[in-house]
Amino acid sequence: MNKFTNFLKKCFTYTPTKKYNFVLEENNANSKDVDLPASFLPDQEVFQSLDKNYNYIKVQYNSLINSDIIMRPFTLNICGKKYSALFVGIDGMIDSELVNNFLLRPLMETNRLARKKRTQNGIEYKKIKKVNVEDYIFDKLLPQNSVQKVSKFSEVASAINSGNCALFIDTVNIAFSIDVKGFSSRGIDTPKNEIVVRGSQEAFVEKLRTNTSILRRLINTPDLIIESSTVGRANKTQIAVCYMKNIANSSLISEVKYRLANLDVDYVISSRKC
């Protein structure tokens, strides 16, 4: 019986092929918990240039490693003139159907209708009316019931982290905060194992993006980093490593990602079972 038990343990229990010692360096007296880059200004106002806004958002949200940040550049047509635009939102916190059908489609397709052609001296031409881009988009192209104009990136970040999306338009020095919140999964319930009297009563569920959205709502800052990867040979299970930039120890983060990358298992059932 013991031999059979040991055989099962070898089949289903992970044992590292080599042992190593990991030592976390202690901080000295002169070290700081948070090192903010000098170029980062929390109250920076939105630029008129879309390229500057795009680059600022990419740095602010670390889009190269943050897996749940959606940045969608596109072109919209206003009265015969094309403008570059940028949509920014968080996967798991926005309603994709609402965004596709009632935000991106009106902006990208509805206003493509050709202007009425006129003829003068035998030459056809299109009469283009000069409009205020900011007011035109706000009044005619955004059908959502809750749309706000924000002028600072701190306001943009707060809106995005709460489940709204941000819309940037080239030549316009404000951003539109649009309510497109939406969740589609099992309802979030109180935790069964970790019961607390104070603090949040929300428990994690089976869907990864719902869990990351819970963290985004509780930790309302762009400094929250969510890196996604897969674990498992037979079944690639999606996982996410979440930490606070400039606060979490970089050596510890690297060690966690190293161990996950070298985890030799077929399937991850839960956080305690492989």
Please place each PLM-identified region on the residue numbering.
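Membrane-embedded alpha-helical signal segments
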Residues: 1-274
